[in-house]
Amino acid sequence: MPPKTEIVRVTPANAAVLDLVAEDVFDRPIDPDLLAAYLAEPGHLMIVAVSQGVVIGQARGMVHRQPDEPTHLYVDNLGVTPSRQREGVALRMMQALFAWARECGCAAYWVATETDNGPARGLYTSLGGDVEAMVFYEGDL
């Protein structure tokens, strides 16, 4: 049985929880200034999964308001250290993001993932979301 895992909403007051992070939870090392700006931003939330004092997973979401659509949760990023995948950690973090989104008045959510990311696609399918094809563009500003 895996060690106990706690799901935590990260705030400026408890951001030190990010001092110990397992491998591959984030894409890059955390920059303290960027973290402070993120946590200060209204409508943004980072959820982490903590086991034995180490962050083993993270999920980030943003409230996306539009003038012509209901308010949505945009799930920006989700990661779980490889050694703790397939234990339901990602599902628990998504459920915590959904609870927060409902508190913020969100009516729905959206998330994107790579077409070849089978585990992520399985998770998002299990949450009842509809698959929609899209094209993604990215560029420097």
Predicted features, each with a name:
Residues R84, G88-A96:
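Conserved acetyl-CoA pyrophosphate-binding loop and the N-cap/start of the following alpha-helix
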Residues T5, V54-Q58, L73:
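Glycine-rich phosphate/pyrophosphate-binding loop shared by adenosine-nucleotide-utilizing enzymes
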Residues A101-A112:
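Conserved GNAT acetyl-CoA-binding A-motif
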Residues D27-M46:
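Active-site rim helix/loop that mediates acceptor-substrate recognition in acyltransferases
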Residues H64-V75, Q85, E132-A133:
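A conserved beta-turn-beta hairpin within the catalytic core of GNAT-like acetyltransferases
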Residues V48, V54-V63, G79:
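Conserved beta-strand in the GNAT
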